[in-house]
């Protein structure tokens, strides 16, 4: 591979993965769609410069390996070095929930939000069961599967993840303050903003903010202006702390406020009651007489587009929509 800040396409990594095109970019580096030449499968290739100031790819690879076998955890195909890059090859997944939210005009139906909530809680429960916390829960880091796994939600990007408990002794990490902020400001927990060591409760609180983001279309602290990122984080933190949960969740079923209030009451080392939280939303789902048929909003929109195309042209045409059923061009590595 040629050494440059932007890797070239049409080259091999790991002796078998041919880069096709770039499909993502972030502070971590580049993400490419690639073809496995041994079986012609599409995969995602994440590239990180060996000269990066804060290398994270090896750490992320080790955590993915540690989590292998869990539902909604992408499979690692290969890790190694090519010229000036650390390389991670993994399953190619579908679009992120942020992509799909934009496709759906930045509003999800209650049915879609509740079906997603169930899977989101289960994904983070598994991660916590492996003594890890994610610390960057946000819509970009939940991706839908493709092909036979089109209805399955995947949790990705473990570059900021951390052990909260020792695997051997079971000892929980100590409560600390004065920590640097870690995460994404609009979804981060209040404790993360305050510099308090994160634990399981913080991941759960972040899920609550993501759900309300999907319900409302935006959160009250989004779009705040500030001269620096630090000042913006401070403004977001202040607004989060001064916005009552009941105000944030006003106009939506009480279960969302109940969820967030429960998470905010958790103590630092306390294990969340994942079953209780899932049940909150499952009971609401049944109360609203929804059918758990995986008819997510983007699937319904795609079907309508296909029907319109068919009726206007006289033949079925596949709509160009970012659904997990047919789009294989989005990588696991969408990151903002």
UniProtKB/Swiss-Prot annotation:
The UniProt entry, under PANTHER family, shows:
CASEIN KINASE-RELATED
Any GO BP annotation? negative regulation of canonical Wnt signaling pathway
Q: Where is the Protein kinase domain?
A: 17-285
Q: Which Cys-Cys disulfides exist here?
A: none
Q: Which reaction does it catalyse?
A: L-seryl-[protein] + ATP = O-phospho-L-seryl-[protein] + ADP + H(+); L-threonyl-[protein] + ATP = O-phospho-L-threonyl-[protein] + ADP + H(+)
Report the enzyme's class at the first EC level: transferase
**EC number of the protein:** 2.7.11.1
How does the annotation summarize its subunit structure?
Monomer.
Give the region (Disordered) as residue ranges. Answer: 309-336
**MF term (GO), any:** ATP binding
Q: Catalytic residues? A: 136
Please report the name of this protein according to its UniProt entry: Casein kinase I isoform beta
Q: Which GO terms describe its cellular component?
A: cytoplasm; Golgi membrane; nucleus
Query: Bias category Low complexity: which stretches?
Result: 309-320
A Pfam family cross-referenced in the UniProt record is: Pkinase
Function recorded in the entry: Casein kinases are operationally defined by their preferential utilization of acidic proteins such as caseins as substrates. It can phosphorylate a large number of proteins. Participates in Wnt signaling.
Keywords of the record: ATP-binding, Cytoplasm, Kinase, Nucleotide-binding, Serine/threonine-protein kinase, Transferase, Wnt signaling pathway
- Work out whether the entry's keyword set contains Cytoplasm: yes
Where is there biased composition of kind Basic and acidic residues?
Answer: 327-336
Name the residues that bind ATP: 23-31, 46
Main location, first listed in the record = cytoplasm
User: Does the keyword Cytoplasm feature in the UniProt annotation?
Assistant: yes
The UniProt family comment states:
Belongs to the protein kinase superfamily. CK1 Ser/Thr protein kinase family. Casein kinase I subfamily.
Q: Where in the cell is it found?
A: Cytoplasm
Under the heading InterPro entries, the entry gives:
CK1_Ser-Thr_kinase (IPR050235), Kinase-like_dom_sf (IPR011009), Prot_kinase_dom (IPR000719), Protein_kinase_ATP_BS (IPR017441), Ser/Thr_kinase_AS (IPR008271)
């Amino acid at each position: 591979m040629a050494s440059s800040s932007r890797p070239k396409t049409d080259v091999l990594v790991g002796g078998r993965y041919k880069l096709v095109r770039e499909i993502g970019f972030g502070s971590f580096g580049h993400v490419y769609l690639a073809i496995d030449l041994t079986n012609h499968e599409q995969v995602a290739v994440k590239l990180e410069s060996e000269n990066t100031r804060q290398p994270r790819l090896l750490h992320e690879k080790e955590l993915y390996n540690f989590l292998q076998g869990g539902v909604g955890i992408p499979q690692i195909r290969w890790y190694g070095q090519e010229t000036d890059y650390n390389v991670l090859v993994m399953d190619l997944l579908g679009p992120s929930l942020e992509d799909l939210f934009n496709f759906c005009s930045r509003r999800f139906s209650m049915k879609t939000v509740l079906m997603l909530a169930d899977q989101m809680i289960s994904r983070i429960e598994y991660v916590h069961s492996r003594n890890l916390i994610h610390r960057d829960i946000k819509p970009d880091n939940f991706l839908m599967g493709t092909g036979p796994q089109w209805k399955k939600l995947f949790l990705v990007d473990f570059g900021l993840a951390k052990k909260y408990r020792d695997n051997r002794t079971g000892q929980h990490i100590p409560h600390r303050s004065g920590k640097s902020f870690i995460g994404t400001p609009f979804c981060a927990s209040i404790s993360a903003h305050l510099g308090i060591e994160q634990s399981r409760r913080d991941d759960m609180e972040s899920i609550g903010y993501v759900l309300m983001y999907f319900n409302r279309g935006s959160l009250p602290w989004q779009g705040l202006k500030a001269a620096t990122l630090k000042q913006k984080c401070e403004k977001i933190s202040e607004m989060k702390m001064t916005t009552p949960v009941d105000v944030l969740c006003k106009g939506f079923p009480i279960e969302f406020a109940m969820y967030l209030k429960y998470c905010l009451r958790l103590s630092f080392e306390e294990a969340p009651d994942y079953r209780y939280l899932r049940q909150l939303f499952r009971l609401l789902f049944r109360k609203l007489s929804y059918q758990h048929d995986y008819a997510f909003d983007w699937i319904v929109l795609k079907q309508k587009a296909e029907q319109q195309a068919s009726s206007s042209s006289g033949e079925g045409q596949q709509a160009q929509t970012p659904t997990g059923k047919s789009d294989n061009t989005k990588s696991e590595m969408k990151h903002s």
